[in-house]
Amino acid sequence: QKETLGKANEVLAEARDRSIPIIYVEVVRGERTPDTEIHHDITPKAGEAVLTKSRTGPFSTTEIDEVLRKQGIETLALMGISTSGCVLTTVRWASDIDYKLVVLSDCCADQDDEVHRVLMEKLFPRQATVVTSQQFLRALG
């Protein structure tokens, strides 16, 4: 997980340098605990949106769609822990409501490495462009 967070941090730093909007989504079911906090290696900076969801995906329990559309955002670059949970749900829902998607494969992780691999290689490419963090950063120019 440390390597995943390090790569995510590189992408976040470049996005900040380029003034690309960053939106964090945290999950809190019931009481807040240290396990529900955003990891200290990728802490949001001042002015970055942090939305709190109570379900697996962000679209059913947050105002994320409204926030994105108000900013004119049409393409989402996704990173997250729980490839088979949060990331999968976000890919499916966001695709259904016409967002263009890029999933950063090495900025996502799952408890089951094989499930992560299958999602990245077989399922996500049907609805998203799957790239590594380095490929994404190179594409930014």
For the regions a language model picked out, list residue spans one by one.
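Short catalytic helix/loop segments, enriched in acidic residues and glycine
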Residues: 1-13
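Active-site-adjacent betaalpha module
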Residues: 10-18, 30-141
